[in-house]
């Protein structure tokens, strides 16, 4: 996520061009961690870490009714690309138990990412 026209400047989240990676808080958090690790490696004269990214988005449609999308991405020749067969979307025909589980997973995801961001 280092700017091609401004070395030393890194762009993450909604301001970045991350190919198929969605504009989401989870993606931005993931990108920011990799950028921080890359900057630390540069300062220490070490190789940058291998770029691998994940994204998970949950949406609560109503009480006990959640949906999700998830994917894994990697760097390929300076671009972000999908890892083949890694993108998953909640099935359209999911039953009530599945939707309820997705709603609970979404609440757990929110608690986890909030803790990751703010509890430091």
Which positions does each model-derived feature cover?
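Flavin (FAD/FMN) cofactor-binding core of flavoprotein oxidoreductases
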Residues: 50-66
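FAD-binding beta-loop-beta segment adjacent to the flavin cofactor pocket
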Residues: 1-10, 61-81
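FAD-site-proximal beta/loop scaffold in flavoenzymes
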Residues: 1-30, 41
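Internal hydrophobic alpha-helix adjacent to the cofactor/substrate pocket in enzyme cavities
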Residues: 28-53
